[in-house]
Amino acid sequence: MPIQVLPPQLANQIAAGEVVERPASVVKELVENSLDAGATRIDIDIERGGAKLIRIRDNGCGIKKDELALALARHATSKIASLDDLEAIISLGFRGEALASISSVSRLTLTSRTAEQQEAWQAYAEGRDMDVTVKPAAHPVGTTLEVLDLFYNTPARRKFLRTEKTEFNHIDEIIRRIALARFDVTINLSHNGKIVRQYRAVPEGGQKERRLGAICGTAFLEQALAIEWQHGDLTLRGWVADPNHTTPALAEIQYCYVNGRMMRDRLINHAIRQACEDKLGADQQPAFVLYLEIDPHQVDVNVHPAKHEVRFHQSRLVHDFIYQGVLSVLQQQLETPLPLDDEPQPAPRPIPENRVAAGRNHFAEPAVREPVAPRYTPAPASGSRPAAPWPNAQPGYQKQQGEVYRQLLQTPAPMQKPKAPEPQEPALAANSQSFGRVLTIVHSDCALLERDGNISLLALPVAERWLRQVQLTPGEAPVCAQPLLIPLRLKVSGEEKSALEKAQSALAELGIDFQSDAQHVTIRAVPLPLRQQNLQILIPELIGYLAKQSVFEPGNIAQWIARNLMSEHAQWSMAQAITLLADVERLCPQLVKTPPGGLLQSVDLHPAIKALKDE
């Protein structure tokens, strides 16, 4: 058989094999087109599970008469025009294949009208060459698509359709997912002339939990913990069910969205599962409805024709971001308030760059948020309950080991640095455990502090280094090892391999897990403070340091690592400084009582005050 160009209908039918799997696939593509058109109301009529009829009517912007024929052509779209558009796609559709593919395996009719037109127009394609016919019609502003007799001309595909009930259940599930993505759109679904679902739009700032409860059920709503988590261009919001009360029915609720697009992403699911693993049984699954917002340039949605999958350019960053966001809410929910002193103490884990932006809790009475000034009291992240301020930081009151991203030790031990200050008595006055309030940032890396009328300067990089050393130093139990998404394999010399084997037990206490063979070592896990570091540089330097040592003490290794970690902040902000000091005050209370050299320097204002008075 000679090489020849396929007829348009056959080419479209082949493409339909990827795009149009079943009636639910048709509904998904058409409803997404309606959303891209700006519709605020979408009516969906289904007959016989979608095999007989699928009708989608919307009140979107409509399609102009002279573009109707193009709308049914392959690779015709109004959503992108260049590679730059594709690399920053924000619309749900963009491939220009859906309508052509659907019309090649069904009897499709497209009726539309724009606000500028006086009348509506109807288009349909037929014949081997898929010629489009356009004629006048009666229709309000918006678009209606009718898909009749799906797979009527491809019997092999039609016989693979399941029962009417099964196919409609798939459609119902698709609509549930879309309704969770767009709270601002009214969606009505009917089957065989009977209204089955009515999802009314929620006004801006309205009670989204109403639709959440209607879609996911009251059982999920009662256990839902609200999430609002942000870092740079990444934002995670939504709800995750309390894993301590997860049931098999709740475990079926697993919805995730990337920039408003519903996804089935293994990386996202793995991050959520890993965050919940300490609280879930081996046969349990987490329940969640989560929305990830990311810079469109950092995600590739052009992976599969059905657009079910995405690729992240920085997959490890996204994984760890979701991991930490979910875990922070789960741990906050577990916190139990204890009797407090007269003054509130810092919260357990202030969320970096997200404290003020933390979302309101829709599932409990709103907590009163104290302002940052005149005294630091961090705003809680949103969760299922108002978070109580953390009680006085005492060695005997810490969370259980295994809180993967909290990197807290069960009993913070004194830092094993030769010149470290002696630990103080557990019961400290409230004021003695605070550096004071942050007034401003000086020279990009120093915090100007005020406490009891006294002014001082604190070196933020030094405080960060001390904090990391405490986080890395094992207490009664080893530091938690966090598995690397992609293990790091390095070539080592015989001397380096010997040093690693001698230091293996000490490294294990620090949360560093590796496996060695003849000439290589594979780093499989590291503690949390190392996850965001450039391990390709840090680990070889650590191996070189170990090769020069004769004694391998975890405290000394932790001290070396803390001194060689790169700071995450070249330019410190007020929020970052406040977060750091809250962690230091909680984990290293001895530093507040007896600051080591290079950390804190008092500023004498008396000469300046005297000079002003002498003027």
From Swiss-Prot:
Residues 363-397 are annotated as: Disordered. CDD domains: HATPase_MutL-MLH-PMS-like (cd16926), MutL_Trans_MutL (cd03482). Keywords: DNA damage, DNA repair. InterPro entries: DNA_mismatch_repair_CS, DNA_mismatch_repair_MutL, DNA_mismatch_S5_2-like, HATPase_C_sf, MutL/Mlh/PMS, MutL/Mlh/Pms-like, MutL_C, MutL_C_dimsub. Transmembrane segments: none annotated. PROSITE patterns: DNA_MISMATCH_REPAIR_1. Pfam families: DNA_mis_repair (PF01119), HATPase_c_3 (PF13589), MutL_C (PF08676). One of its GO terms (molecular function) is ATP binding. One of its GO terms (biological process) is mismatch repair. The keyword Transmembrane does not apply. Belongs to the DNA mismatch repair MutL/HexB family. This is DNA mismatch repair protein MutL. It comes from Escherichia coli O157:H7 (strain EC4115 / EHEC).
